[in-house]
């Protein structure tokens, strides 16, 4: 069936944006959307180059969001370095996992964790001898190798997927407040008022980074959302689900969600990525 076939490049609907918000003095967020292809390098030919400059088969699609930790020196530089490092790692290392063979999935998951730790080391190196107060950032990446998808997370930038009429959050906030909830010391409904809601328990470049990887099957018309907490502090999960359910295009959803967050104060930097694989006729 066509629904089970790997989506063509023209079936992909991908869009991302970032906004400083209405309060912060700078934007410390960064994002990247990319596809990895097999390509031909031509070193000499008598043929017209227009016949040869064709990308090979796409074997992976990915999106990354990084939110530089506010209040630390170099938060913007940290998020940029994290995104650059993980993109380079993906390009140079993950090609060997171009087929998500179940027998190789454990090794692939470890490679993703290795990518996060590589970014952690790169950002830590920016801080010199600083033990506690160097630059830091969140990092959340979704990477699809059809028909599987993987979500890598450090920090509290989130990943959601909407499908079959329901929204699922695929990440757990790595914050002190969430740790309190998990231990029973704090009620989930009290997190928004907790002074620890934005205190990261794990961060790229922080004291420690604890990369978490989850895996799922991809389906056409599932909608994936990656975002920094500048969106989710103003827009509820229920509202996210409504927006993704009514998608006309990835760009439209990103713009609608950004507008809603800004209307409600835009108190932090806001970064949003939306992606889906459409059915060929949609």
Language-model features: where?
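PP2C/PPM-type serine/threonine phosphatase catalytic domain
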Residues: 1-282
């Amino acid at each position: 069936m066509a629904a089970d076939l790997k989506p063509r490049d023209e079936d992909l609907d991908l869009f991302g944006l970032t906004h400083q918000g209405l309060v912060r003095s700078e934007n410390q967020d960064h994002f990247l959307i990319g596809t990895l292809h097999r390509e031909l390098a031509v070193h000499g030919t008598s043929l017209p180059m227009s016949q040869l400059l064709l990308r090979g088969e796409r074997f992976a699609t990915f999106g990354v969001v990084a939110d530089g930790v506010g209040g630390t020196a170099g938060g913007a530089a940290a998020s940029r370095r994290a995104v650059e490092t993980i993109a380079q790692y993906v390009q140079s290392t993950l090609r060997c996992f171009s087929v998500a063979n179940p027998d190789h999935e454990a090794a692939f998951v470890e490679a993703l964790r290795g990518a996060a730790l590589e970014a952690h080391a790169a950002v830590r190196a920016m801080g010199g001898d600083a033990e506690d107060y160097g630059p830091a950032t969140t990092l959340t990446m979704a990477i699809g190798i059809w028909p599987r998808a993987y979500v890598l997370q450090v920090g509290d930038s989130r990943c959601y997927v909407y499908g079959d009429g329901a929204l699922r959050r695929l990440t757990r906030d790595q914050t002190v407040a969430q740790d309190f909830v998990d231990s029973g010391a704090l009620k989930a409904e009290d997190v928004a008022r907790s002074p620890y809601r934005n205190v990261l328990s794990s961060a790229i470049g922080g004291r420690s980074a604890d990369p978490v990887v989850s895996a799922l099957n991809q389906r056409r018309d599932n909608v994936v959302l990656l975002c920094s907490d500048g969106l989710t502090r103003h827009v509820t999960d229920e509202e996210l689900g409504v927006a993704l359910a009514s998608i006309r295009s990835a760009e439209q959803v990103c713009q609608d969600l950004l507008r809603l967050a800004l209307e409600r104060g835009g108190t932090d930097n806001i970064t949003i990525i939306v992606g889906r694989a459409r059915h060929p006729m949609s």
